[in-house]
């Protein structure tokens, strides 16, 4: 059977069918159980981060090294020709694509990875996050973690809490989970940071069900997954940030009455929306979730670069 992801650009989670997602997750499970340290040797992958990142960049680079490939790139675009000399993104990508087998790109501008894919020729572009738009590889590790903890991706009750307006992780994850049957979403956010209408419209089109709530407590007993997010200071003006940053904070005492199988996830970094006492509960799974980023990204890279 042909690999449908070979040399494919991964810009949006909507670029992947349910079958594609299942292939990535199966591959991730295999690589987690049985590492393959020479699978991508001697390929070279560019890591181009035009926006600050810790987990995504390091997990991508770890994934690349553990598959036997080499990584080149930058984590601060201000020291590149684009940053210092005014080179266009199109020209930057046109040149880098001549050097490498794939390009991982994070950019603050929505649509930048899609634009990059128009100038990369045959070199695949993998979106590591573009503004408030999409974060498909975070979604892959989230799906992998949900499947790992719940043994399924359908018929789940999933709460998404916090910044649902600017949080690209919840945009991508809700769209991905809508490809699976029977999932219900509980959206819990301040009115100013509610899930955008275009995401709700997409869920309606796919037949997914959702409800919107003012607090976690009223839905907690129903939940299988509680997906917390931080309020993104960098995308808000100071007065708006001050008004909403502490509106939804999860404490260990809030988890009394939760289902035994509940897992609390977070794309990280957290600020103060999950208190440290939650870390000691059996529900906390966000650090294991972060580790799973290595396996999900290994799986995607191996499928994109191996026929």
Curated annotation (Swiss-Prot):
Q: Which PROSITE patterns match?
A: CARBAMOYLTRANSFERASE
Q: Which SUPFAM superfamilies match?
A: Aspartate/ornithine carbamoyltransferase
Kindly list the GO CC terms recorded for this protein.
cytosol
Reactions this protein catalyses? carbamoyl phosphate + L-aspartate = N-carbamoyl-L-aspartate + phosphate + H(+)
Residues the record lists as binding carbamoyl phosphate: 55-56, 106, 135, 138, 268-269
Q: What's an example GO BP annotation here? A: 'de novo' pyrimidine nucleobase biosynthetic process
Tell me a Gene Ontology molecular-function term this record carries. Answer: amino acid binding
Give the matching InterPro entries. Answer: Asp/Orn_carbamoyltranf_P-bd (IPR006132), Asp/Orn_carbamoylTrfase (IPR006130), Asp/Orn_carbamoylTrfase_sf (IPR036901), Asp_carbamoyltransf (IPR002082), Asp_carbamoyltransf_Asp/Orn-bd (IPR006131)
In the record, the note on similarity to other proteins reads: Belongs to the aspartate/ornithine carbamoyltransferase superfamily. ATCase family.
Q: What's the protein here called?
A: Aspartate carbamoyltransferase catalytic subunit
User: Origin organism of this chain?
Assistant: Photorhabdus laumondii subsp. laumondii (strain DSM 15139 / CIP 105565 / TT01) (Photorhabdus luminescens subsp. laumondii)
Q: Which gene encodes it?
A: pyrB
